[in-house]
Design a protein with these regions (language model features):
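Core catalytic alpha/beta fold that binds nucleotide/phospho-ligands
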Residues: 1-198
Length: 198
């Protein structure tokens, strides 16, 4: 699907290969598909999809020790982020003004938590749309209705389903999809990808 050799960073090359191997393993585990049973192609906006007796979209993300995959019969985006200290200089440069204000009202662990919730939701949305970082992160606002995130563009609510994925307390992971679809989410620890299927 990707030209893995094009990545200069050996770690990125390795993780990309592991991620694509994970997709093939899941296609077999979930639907019994062997590699000759399907074609992986790049759709509009550079988003990968599987064409077989059915069509399924998928998306990958990796951070720290985890690679996560989301599958859906409609377009989908997923992002995982290992929590660290909030980078307020990044927020001030890239986030929506309302998000920056919310972050500035917090400190310590609460600020760190919200920063990575924002970041993961935003990344999952950009991966859902396929626009990547060509669309500015400040061009839309994330608001949390309780723990459920919503996305507003020019004060208009986007009709999407955005859900938190409970992967690990040290990570934030969100998936973004059409409201009619509940994606399948599959997290893997990187070392586990070297284990054979049971």
């Amino acid at each position: 699907v990707r030209k893995v050799t094009g990545y200069k960073n050996p770690g990125v090359r390795r993780t990309t290969l592991l991620g694509e191997g994970m997709i093939r393993r899941l296609l077999f585990r979930l639907w019994g598909l062997h590699k000759e049973d399907y074609l992986i192609r790049i759709g509009e906006h550079g988003k990968p999809l599987v064409e077989s007796r059915f069509t399924v979209w998928y998306n990958l993300s990796h951070s720290g020790d985890y690679i996560v995959a989301a599958f859906s019969h409609l377009e989908v985006g997923i992002d995982i982020e290992q929590k660290r200290k909030a980078r307020m200089e990044v927020a001030r440069r890239f986030f929506h003004p309302a998000e920056i204000q919310c972050l500035q009202n917090l400190a310590g662990d609460a600020q760190d938590e919200l920063f990575f919730r924002y970041w993961s939701v935003k990344e999952s949305f950009l991966k859902y749309t396929g626009s990547g970082l060509s669309s500015p992160l400040s061009g839309f606002e994330v608001r949390f209705d309780g723990h459920r995130p919503r996305i507003f563009q020019s004060e208009n609510l986007r009709n999407l389903s955005i859900s938190a994925c409970p992967v690990d307390p040290a990570y934030k992971c969100f998936v973004c999809a059409e409201t009619t679809e509940e994606p399948g989410i599959f997290p893997f620890l990187v070392p586990d990808l070297f284990l054979p299927d049971e």
